[in-house]
């Protein structure tokens, strides 16, 4: 399973990219809005220079014509740009048109398996089920991932399943076990995933033993 970073913060991207684990980046209007004074195009292009993989940039139009217009513009910014559109009927129209142009789309805000099936049939490159938000309404978000993966495999659908709205490191594990192709994570979750008290204790013990051995020679 690939790991993407869910952020528009360039410092976070630079740091995570230095770990050698990133295969892509996802952004959205809310994440962009956190970066005060940032230019959308320049930010996406800078991200593409830092991470060699799909970079999702989201259209803000609600109608298919607007999404297509934005998507075609985004696609000129960098070959790795993937256009994000919502799981709506207008989004499906946009995906089918953009796909015919050879422009890859990430269909976002997916909350049921039928939306995922429709997106795939329209030509989506990626489908993004929001597991954390599904959990929030009392339903198991990972069951949605499992349903989509099962449907796609049964019907030889090549659309990639991206687990979004990741809230904690366990979500990453569960997404991998459920068969997701990608998990996109906030920076703090990636950091948390590499922290464990036993790792810290082990390092301290190894260093203490090494120091004692060196002093006793």
Curated annotation (Swiss-Prot):
One BP annotation, GO: carbohydrate metabolic process
Top-level taxon in the UniProt lineage: Bacteria
GO cellular component, one term: cytoplasm
Pathway: Carbohydrate degradation; pentose phosphate pathway; D-glyceraldehyde 3-phosphate and beta-D-fructose 6-phosphate from D-ribose 5-phosphate and D-xylulose 5-phosphate (non-oxidative stage): step 2/3
Catalytic activity: D-sedoheptulose 7-phosphate + D-glyceraldehyde 3-phosphate = D-erythrose 4-phosphate + beta-D-fructose 6-phosphate
GO molecular function terms attached to this record: aldehyde-lyase activity; transaldolase activity
Enzyme class: transferase
Gene3D superfamilies on file: Aldolase class I
Catalytic residue list: 84
Primary residence: cytoplasm
The protein's Enzyme Commission number: 2.2.1.2
InterPro entries named in the record: Aldolase_TIM, TAL/FSA, Transaldolase_3B, Transaldolase_3B/F6P_aldolase, Transaldolase_AS, TSA/FSA_arc/bac
Any single Pfam family the record assigns to this protein: TAL_FSA
Keyword Transcription tagged: no
Subcellular location: Cytoplasm
Role, per record: Transaldolase is important for the balance of metabolites in the pentose-phosphate pathway.
Family: Belongs to the transaldolase family. Type 3B subfamily.
Protein's UniProt name: Probable transaldolase
Gene name per UniProt: tal
């Amino acid at each position: 399973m690939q790991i993407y970073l869910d952020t528009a913060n360039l410092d976070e991207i630079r740091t995570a990219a230095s770990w050698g684990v990133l295969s892509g980046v996802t952004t959205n209007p809310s994440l962009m809005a956190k970066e005060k004074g940032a230019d959308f195009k320049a930010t996406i292009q800078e991200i593409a220079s830092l991470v060699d993989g799909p970079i999702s940039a989201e259209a803000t139009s609600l109608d298919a014509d607007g999404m297509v217009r934005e998507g075609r513009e985004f696609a000129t910014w960098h070959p790795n740009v993937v256009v994000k559109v919502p799981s709506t009927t207008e989004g499906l129209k946009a995906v089918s048109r953009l796909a015919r142009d050879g422009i890859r789309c990430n269909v976002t805000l997916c909350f049921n398996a039928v939306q995922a099936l429709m997106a795939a049939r329209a030509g989506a490159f990626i489908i993004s089920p929001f597991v954390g938000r599904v959990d929030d309404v009392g339903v198991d978000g990972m069951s949605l991932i499992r349903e989509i993966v099962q449907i796609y495999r049964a019907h030889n659908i090549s659309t990639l399943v991206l687990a979004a709205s990741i809230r904690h490191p366990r979500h990453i594990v569960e997404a991998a076990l459920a068969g997701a192709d990608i998990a996109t994570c906030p920076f703090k979750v990636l950091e948390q995933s590499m922290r464990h008290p036993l790792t810290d204790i082990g390092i301290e013990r190894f260093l203490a033993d090494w120091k004692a051995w060196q002093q006793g020679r």
